[in-house]
């Protein structure tokens, strides 16, 4: 993905997008099987960034609902009246330059329904279990 950094006091004073790269560790054993990442609207902030990175991995699938967003390296400041304000200071993007501040879409969208909740069934977990059973690679 990409990240921009604040460069001035103006509303749109940000750097050009800078690519962010992650490389796997080469000095230890790595998990080589499929992974299901479960999300919903309560997955936000650092989780949003984690989900965005996991979506780029060939053996990872994101299952559930769109994340709640809110990455972007939050900045906190105090206003002259004593109130604190917190906001994203560094817009973040996926590899296709889609802004992720407002959430990351799942690969497989699953909604929890009231009937399953009443029965104690977690539709997202059950979908992930089924996916992993069928993708044992």
Go through each PLM region and give its residues.
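Active-site-proximal beta-strand/loop segments in catalytic clefts of secreted hydrolases
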Residues: 6-7, 38-42, 64-67, 88-90
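Low-complexity, Gly/Ser/Thr/Pro-rich intrinsically disordered linker/tail segments
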Residues: 106-137
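Terminal peptide-recognition signature
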Residues: 35, 54, 97, 128
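Stable alpha-helical elements in mature extracytoplasmic
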Residues: 46-50, 59, 120-128
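Loop/turn elements at helix/coil->beta-strand transitions in domains of secreted/extracellular proteins
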Residues: 32-34, 58-61, 135
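Gly/Ser/Thr-rich loop/hinge elements
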Residues: 1-34, 72-76, 89-93, 99-100
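Soluble non-cytosolic domains of exported or imported proteins
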Residues: 29, 41-45, 115-123
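Short, well-structured beta-strand/strand-turn elements
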Residues: 44, 57-70
């Amino acid at each position: 993905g990409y990240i921009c950094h604040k460069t001035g006091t103006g509303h749109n004073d940000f750097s050009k997008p800078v690519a962010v790269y992650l490389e796997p560790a080469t000095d230890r054993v790595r998990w080589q099987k499929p992974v299901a990442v479960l999300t919903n609207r309560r997955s936000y902030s650092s989780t949003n960034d984690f989900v965005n990175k996991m979506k780029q991995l060939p053996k990872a699938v994101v299952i559930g609902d769109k994340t709640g967003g809110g990455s972007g390296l939050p900045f906190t400041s105090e206003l002259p009246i004593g109130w604190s304000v917190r906001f994203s200071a560094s817009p973040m993007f996926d590899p296709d330059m889609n802004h992720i501040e407002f959430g990351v879409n799942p690969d497989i969208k699953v909604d929890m329904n009231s009937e399953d909740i009443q029965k104690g069934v977690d539709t997202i977990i059950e979908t992930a279990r089924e996916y992993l059973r069928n993708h044992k690679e």
